[in-house]
């Protein structure tokens, strides 16, 4: 692909809310073009123009044929773990780079992505928002300073249809704090509380979750000390910020060889 040639982008889950946001972001970004729009087999969107629902017909027909990825340079995927892993295998077959914003992978799914990154370039991040990734840098700084005498609690809220909890963003926030403390998150996490929980154990990281309505995504990390409390928050009002970040990640991959990258690498943080 020469510099003058647009990067050919494929979108998975093309008829969904996030898929439509991604399509719009691609159509609005110079240097990229929508080449492939994928959806699940049996979807009523199959055969329709990918931009029609946006009022922006683009000449790309939604398909369920994964071999259509041969026409793309990079796939952006915000679907479900099982679907993303199927798409990953198709990307390996056709040497297509991949931006993965899907959350909820188990350890074997994450391992599969790591192995695939030895052959293709992948950006794998639970949150593509530039603001969230700036927030992670602030969290790292705060956790290194507030490493003694402060209790950490992570609160997150999302819409009623989100199926994994805590969110991938909340988990990476917890991992950021744990890493700054030189501990592993599973060793210090408190996932739920109910009944007589006893006194809070020092050095633990608590999580609390809300699911309801159409909340796009709220995250707050509390550093609770004696006589003071520091709160670092990020609130999303639109999925557009995730879509814009994902397209930015795809542009980053155009310059990369095989390897596994996160949004910190994309943003140069």
From Swiss-Prot:
PROSITE patterns on file: DAPB
Subcellular location as annotated: Cytoplasm
Annotated residues for binding of NADP(+): 40
Cysteines engaged in disulfide bonds, as pairs: none
Pathway the protein contributes to: Amino-acid biosynthesis; L-lysine biosynthesis via DAP pathway; (S)-tetrahydrodipicolinate from L-aspartate: step 4/4
Catalytic activity: (S)-2,3,4,5-tetrahydrodipicolinate + NAD(+) + H2O = (2S,4S)-4-hydroxy-2,3,4,5-tetrahydrodipicolinate + NADH + H(+); (S)-2,3,4,5-tetrahydrodipicolinate + NADP(+) + H2O = (2S,4S)-4-hydroxy-2,3,4,5-tetrahydrodipicolinate + NADPH + H(+)
E.C. designation(s): 1.17.1.8
PANTHER family named in the record: 4-HYDROXY-TETRAHYDRODIPICOLINATE REDUCTASE 1, CHLOROPLASTIC-RELATED (PTHR20836:SF0), DIHYDRODIPICOLINATE REDUCTASE (PTHR20836)
Family: Belongs to the DapB family.
Protein name per Swiss-Prot or TrEMBL: 4-hydroxy-tetrahydrodipicolinate reductase
Organism: Bordetella parapertussis (strain 12822 / ATCC BAA-587 / NCTC 13253)
Lineage of the species this protein comes from: Bacteria, Pseudomonadati, Pseudomonadota, Betaproteobacteria, Burkholderiales
